[in-house]
Curated annotation (Swiss-Prot):
Keywords: Disulfide bond, Seed storage protein, Storage protein. Pfam families: Tryp_alpha_amyl (PF00234). InterPro entries: Bifun_inhib/LTP/seed_sf, Bifunc_inhib/LTP/seed_store, Napin/2SS/CON. Residues 27-49 are annotated as: Disordered. The protein consists of two chains linked by disulfide bonds. Inhibits trypsin with a Ki of 7 x 10(-6) M. It comes from the Eukaryota. Residues 32-49 have a biased composition (Low complexity). PANTHER family: 2S SEED STORAGE PROTEIN 1-RELATED. This is Trypsin inhibitor.
Length: 130
């Protein structure tokens, strides 16, 4: 499956970055947290996990930041869907968590101060060509 990787080299970067493992953990954590979105944080208060995620993104070339993030978000979405089925979670709750994954992922480049990338243009549900 081509997934979000129309550029083969981004797929390679994604694999080299171990699928942005820290970013996946961070997205997973954010999706699971209830309450209103992330609190506005200066670089000083970045949780270590977020810092790791930012480091991973900084290693990508700018062109690949969004595709690799999209790949990470998709992986987390699948994890959450599987866990949701195991726990018999309501669809509503799952939808909510999945929305949060993409909300968080959309703004990661900005949170991480990635040069040239502010926001990844994920559309809300992102069926997209996968």
């Amino acid at each position: 499956p081509a997934g979000p990787f129309r550029l083969p080299r981004c797929r390679k970067e994604f694999q080299q970055a171990q699928h942005l493992r820290a970013c996946q953990q961070w997205l997973h954590k954010q999706a699971r947290q209830s309450g209103s979105g992330p609190s506005p944080q200066g670089p000083q208060q970045r949780p270590p996990l977020l810092q790791q995620c930012c480091n991973e993104l900084h290693q990508e070339e700018p062109l690949c930041v969004c595709p690799t993030l999209k790949g990470a978000a998709k992986a987390v979405k699948q994890q959450i869907q599987q866990q949701g089925q195991q726990h018999g979670q309501q669809g509503q709750q799952l939808q909510h968590e999945i929305r949060r994954i993409y909300q968080t992922a959309t703004h990661l480049p900005k949170v991480c101060n990635i040069p040239q990338v502010q926001v990844c243009p994920f559309n809300k549900t992102m069926p997209g060509p996968s």
